[in-house]
Design a protein with these regions (language model features):
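Small-residue-rich midsections of specific transmembrane alpha-helices
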Residues: 1-26, 41, 45-52, 87-93, ...
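Helix-terminus/linker motif at the lipid-water interface of multi-pass membrane proteins
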Residues: 1, 65-68, 128-131, 190-193, ...
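Interhelical loop/hinge segments that connect adjacent transmembrane helices in multipass membrane
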Residues: 152-201, 205, 215
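Membrane-interface junctions at transmembrane-helix termini in multi-pass inner-membrane proteins
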Residues: 87-112, 130, 135
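Alpha-helical transmembrane segments of multi-pass membrane proteins
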Residues: 54-65, 70-93, 110, 114, ...
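Hydrophobic alpha-helical transmembrane segments
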Residues: 77, 81, 111-162, 181, ...
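Interfacial/gating helices of multi-pass transporter permease domains
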Residues: 1-9, 37, 134-139, 177-185, ...
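Alpha-helical transmembrane segments of multi-pass membrane transport and lipid-handling proteins
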Residues: 42-70, 122-129, 150
Length: 218
């Protein structure tokens, strides 16, 4: 859904900026620095999840104006909020994956993510064939996405259990000041992300406003 894609702009490029900032301390085994960056990253992503939920709830007020044609508006709201929940939840789990990706050890979690993805797709196909229920399809999307991220995070926690605690005696304010370059990079990346969304994702929203969902899908 392009409307959910719009909400993802709230990510601001935090993941890219943090991932870039991890390369140098990882290469020099500066685990205290890495731990501080990950605490900051967790703080940012939790706030982004909250912002997406709030903005998503607000934008839902405009769904009747964005959807044309004969559509069950109640079902549209249910599907929309399920997608919104799926989007928000991902920010509570995926920040740890940035660490292992920056450390070039993504292969250690690929098994969990790929296996749950394959099982999810098979289960969704079976459900669609038997029930023709899009609601259950989205529900499976959320459940298996969460399962994959939880398993991946357990592996990441085990991988860095002796070095990364995600805890510090420092306050978030101090950690921000010590890593001011991350905020600067986030600002630079945000405008590129916004431009990319405007160019590639607004078409479907505009088509749905002036046409209907069937033509939007085509």
């Amino acid at each position: 859904m392009s409307l959910i894609g719009f909400l993802n702009v709230a990510e601001l490029g935090v993941g890219v900026a943090v991932g870039y900032s991890l390369y140098e301390p990882l290469s020099k085994n500066k685990y205290e620095k890495i731990n501080d960056i990950m605490i900051l990253f967790k703080y940012y992503y939790r706030n982004i999840a909250k912002i997406i939920l709030i903005l998503g709830a607000f934008l839902s007020l405009f769904l009747p104006f964005l959807i044309k044609g004969q559509v069950n508006i109640n079902l549209a709201y249910i599907y929309y909020f399920l997608y919104l929940i799926n989007c928000s939840i991902s920010y509570l789990f995926t920040y740890k994956q940035t660490l292992i990706i920056a450390d070039q050890k993504q292969y250690k979690i690929a098994y969990f993510l790929n296996t749950t993805k394959i099982i999810k797709m098979i289960a969704q196909c079976i459900v669609l064939y038997i029930t023709r229920s899009f609601f259950v399809w989205i529900l499976f999307e959320i459940i298996f996405n969460c399962l994959g991220m939880i398993l991946a995070n357990k592996k990441i926690n085990f991988e860095y259990k002796n070095n990364i605690t995600y805890k510090s005696s420092k306050t978030i304010k101090i950690i921000k000041e010590e890593n001011a370059h991350i905020s600067k990079n986030i600002g630079n990346i945000f405008f590129h992300k916004l431009a990319g969304f405007i160019v590639g994702q607004t078409d479907a929203i505009l088509i749905s406003i002036f046409s209907n969902l069937k033509e939007t899908g085509i």
